[in-house]
A protein has these predicted regions:
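Bacterial N-terminal signal peptides
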Residues: 8-16
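Positively charged n-region of N-terminal signal peptides that target proteins for export
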Residues: 1-4
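Intrinsically disordered, low-complexity, charge-dense segments enriched in Lys/Arg
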Residues: 29, 46, 144-160
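Short, glycine/polar-rich helix-capping loops at beta-to-alpha or helix-loop-helix junctions
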Residues: 107-108, 130
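Conserved mixed alpha/beta catalytic, RNA-binding, or beta-rich assembly cores of soluble enzyme
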Residues: 26-102, 122-142
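Short acidic, glycine/proline-enriched helix-loop-strand junctions
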Residues: 108-122
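Sec-dependent signal peptide cleavage junction
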Residues: 17-25
């Protein structure tokens, strides 16, 4: 099953050109973006930093929050399955260098452009849906009117 998913992902890279900044087969340290994306497989987040690959398996924005707290994202390359505005703001807060995702929400793109983060994606969607797929993701709802990465980080790390 993993090989089939990896093959499908590879076909997406061949069939759908990278959007925006990344050129096909661009090297990111020791790997191309395609190679890093294939390594993501069933994980939710892959971070390539200082020659090391780290995986996170939690759902939503938790993988980003864990990575920021544990090892940081400064000058890292992140490969995430889905990126909305909340994830984009957290990635900028963590000072990520490059990002690739399969699915990106329209409102995440201006965040990366404003902060000059290199990004690529396979598909753009209007917004990130909640788990029931009947509305906006609650994390996206929290940052709907937020444009500051620092403020977004504070919102998501605030003790309830």
């Amino acid at each position: 099953m993993k090989k089939i998913l990896a093959l499908l992902l590879l076909l997406c890279f061949v069939a759908v050109p990278f959007s925006n900044v990344f050129a096909e087969n661009e090297k990111c340290g020791d790997y191309t973006i395609e190679e890093l994306a294939l390594k993501l497989e069933n994980h939710s987040l892959l971070v390539y930093k200082d020659g090391n690959i780290t995986f996170q398996d939690e759902h939503g924005i938790q993988p980003l929050l864990i990575q920021i707290k544990k090892k940081g994202l400064k000058n890292a390359i992140a490969v995430d399955k889905v990126i909305g505005k909340a994830a984009a703001l957290l990635m900028v807060y963590g000072k990520v260098k490059q990002v690739h995702t399969n699915i990106i929400a329209k409102d995440a793109i201006p965040v990366f452009e404003k902060y000059k983060v290199e990004y690529s994606y396979n598909e753009v969607v209007d917004y990130i849906q909640n788990m029931k797929k009947d509305g906006l993701c609650p994390m996206e709802q929290k940052v709907l009117k937020v444009n500051s990465p620092k403020k977004a980080y504070k919102i998501f790390t605030k003790k309830q």
